[in-house]
From Swiss-Prot:
Assembly and oligomerization: Homodecamer; pentamer of dimers.
Keyword annotations of the record: Cytoplasm, Magnesium, Metal-binding, Pantothenate biosynthesis, Transferase
Organism of derivation: Escherichia coli (strain SMS-3-5 / SECEC)
HAMAP family xref list: PanB
EC number annotated for this UniProt entry: 2.1.2.11
Active site: E181 (proton acceptor)
Binding residues for 3-methyl-2-oxobutanoate: D45, S46, D84, K112
Encoding gene, per UniProt annotation: panB
Functional summary from the UniProt entry: Catalyzes the reversible reaction in which hydroxymethyl group from 5,10-methylenetetrahydrofolate is transferred onto alpha-ketoisovalerate to form ketopantoate.
Catalytic reaction(s) noted: 3-methyl-2-oxobutanoate + (6R)-5,10-methylene-5,6,7,8-tetrahydrofolate + H2O = 2-dehydropantoate + (6S)-5,6,7,8-tetrahydrofolate
Binding site for Mg(2+): D45, D84, E114
UniProt protein name: 3-methyl-2-oxobutanoate hydroxymethyltransferase
GO molecular function: 3-methyl-2-oxobutanoate hydroxymethyltransferase activity; magnesium ion binding
Length: 264
């Protein structure tokens, strides 16, 4: 199988072809996703909640991310694999580079970091040293204590303009992908159209270039609160492989996320 690359996603954006991505944390699910053609995966610090049972992503360490990244890479050797740098793993550019090197050696193709213009120097340093970067704006879970909970971000002209400014700054610094989480559809559209790099949405409507879901949300195995943007594809299909195929098909056709999964 031909490897999926950042260039593959750039071509999807140019061709206006939506693409699906998903979180993965272990060998078996990564292998299954790859076999079904779902070839862009994220080892997210969401594993702190979905795998480790914490109430936030904050306890996750670089060692945790590296461990799960290696497992996913063994299951999906040709996927485009993103890995989160967890809380306090990129407080300085130098620290970011050291920790990025750890997860890249474990098998990641790219690191994802949360934050806006304050990260410009870090993004520049990483990209200059051959570490591809995916930005993450909107609801950034590592900042949950500042936000006062998991809330929609970017509502109102001032907040929306700031997120757009952040997105443009990250792109100019060298970021090659951007995740937008829990923002109004209208703002997601503005940002997606303003950037040359692919934008992946989660809770950002169907106007972004791609979509991502936490695998536990996609299969309805998340305990407690279910995010508005989540959809249980396993409930409709009764089979994990069929659920993966349906998720991909609905993203590519624009059916998912629907209005009921979106914010304004």
């Amino acid at each position: 199988m031909k490897p999926t690359t950042i260039a593959s996603l750039q071509k999807c954006k140019q061709d206006k072809k939506r693409f699906a991505t998903i979180t993965a944390y272990d060998y078996s699910f990564a292998k299954l996703f790859a076999e079904e053609g779902l070839n862009v995966m994220l080892v997210g610090d969401s594993l702190g909640m979905t795998v480790q049972g914490h109430d936030s992503t904050l306890p996750v360490t670089v060692a945790d991310i590296a461990y799960h990244t290696a497992a996913v890479r063994r299951g999906a050797p040709n996927c485009l694999l993103l890995a989160d740098l967890p809380f306090m793993a990129y407080a300085t550019p130098e620290q970011a580079f050291e920790n990025a090197a750890t997860v890249m050696r474990a098998g990641a193709n790219m690191v994802k970091i949360e934050g806006g213009e304050w990260l410009v120097e870090t993004v520049q340093m990483l990209t200059e040293r051959a570490v591809p970067v995916c930005g993450h704006l909107g609801l950034t879970p590592q900042s949950v204590n500042i936000f006062g909970g998991y809330k929609v971000q970017g509502r109102g002209d001032e907040a929306g303009d700031q997120l757009l400014s952040d997105a443009l700054a990250l792109e100019a610094a060298g970021a090659q992908l951007l995740v937008l989480e829990c923002v109004p559809v209208e703002l997601a559209k503005r940002i997606t159209e303003a950037l040359a790099i692919p934008v992946i949405g989660i809770g950002a409507g169907n106007v972004t270039d791609g979509q991502i879901l936490v695998m536990h949300d996609a299969f309805g195995i998340t305990g407690g609160h279910i995010p508005k943007f989540a959809k249980n594809f396993l409930a409709e299909t009764g089979d994990i492989r069929a659920a993966v195929r349906q998720y991909m098909a609905e993203v590519e056709s624009g059916v998912y996320p629907g209005e009921e999964h979106s914010f304004h």
